[in-house]
Every structure is written in C-alpha cells, then in structure tokens.
C-alpha cells in the first residue's frame, strides 16, 4: 500500500517532541488541560466546538481525537455531524462575506474588461 499522507502520531514521536522542548511541551499540556476543563461550557460543548474547528483548520489528528472525545463526552453522531456542518457553513460563509472586499475593490477601479 502507499504511505499515508499524514504519519502516525506515535508514542516515540510524542516523546521526541517533549525531549526537544520540555518546558514548552509542559506549558502546552497545561494550557490544553485548562482549556478543556469544565467551566462555563461543559465538556460536550467544548468538544463539539473542537470538532468543528478541527474541520476548519483541517487537522486530521484533531478531527480524529476530538471526535472521539466529543463522543465520550456524550455527543451523539448527529450532534457531531451537525457541528461539522456548522463549521462548513462558516468556512463557506467567510468566502461569501469576503466577496464584499472584492466588490469594493472592483467598484473603485476603472475596468477595460468585464468578467
């Protein structure tokens, strides 16, 4: 078979990352724990947000990891899929909204052509 596009996130790779920057790695781990700790938002909501953002940032490791964590936090398949659809709309909506910039730019220039 062919090589995967994204290599596996193995224990050895994680250990090497910690070895190369232990203080930063420890700080990031603590940041992660604090962000995903119960607070104003429950775990399920935080993980659904993470699933949606992972799709927008297109991180395959995050998609897999946060989908599992969302499910463990009580999110059902339909809720997870709905979060993904919200992310898809927001990404598409961003392109749609930014067309305003292109239209303003075009309106401010003299054009010799159309299209």
Whereabouts are the PLM-identified features?
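Immediate flanking context of iron-sulfur cluster ligation sites
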Residues: 39-57, 78-84
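Histidine-centered active-site/metal-ligand motif
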Residues: 55, 66, 98
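C-terminal structural segments of small proteins and small subunits
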Residues: 81-106
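Acidic, glycine/proline-rich low-complexity segments that act as flexible tails and inter-domain linkers
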Residues: 1-45, 97-115
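Short cysteine clusters
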Residues: 59-62
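Iron-sulfur (Fe-S) cluster-binding segments and ferredoxin-like electron-carrier domains
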Residues: 25-26, 64-79
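Amphipathic alpha-helical segments within well-ordered protein domains
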Residues: 32-33, 50, 67-71, 85
């Amino acid at each position: 078979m062919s090589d995967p596009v994204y290599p596996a996130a193995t224990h050895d790779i994680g250990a090497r990352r910690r070895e190369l920057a232990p203080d930063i790695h420890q700080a990031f781990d603590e940041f992660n724990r604090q962000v995903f700790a119960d607070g104003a938002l429950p775990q399920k909501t935080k993980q659904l947000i993470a699933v949606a953002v992972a799709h927008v940032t297109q991180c395959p490791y995050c998609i897999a990891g946060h989908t599992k964590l969302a499910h463990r936090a009580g999110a059902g398949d339909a809720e997870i899929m709905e979060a993904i659809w919200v992310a898809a709309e927001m990404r598409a909506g961003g392109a749609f909204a930014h067309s305003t910039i292109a239209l303003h730019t075009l309106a401010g220039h003299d054009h010799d052509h159309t299209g």
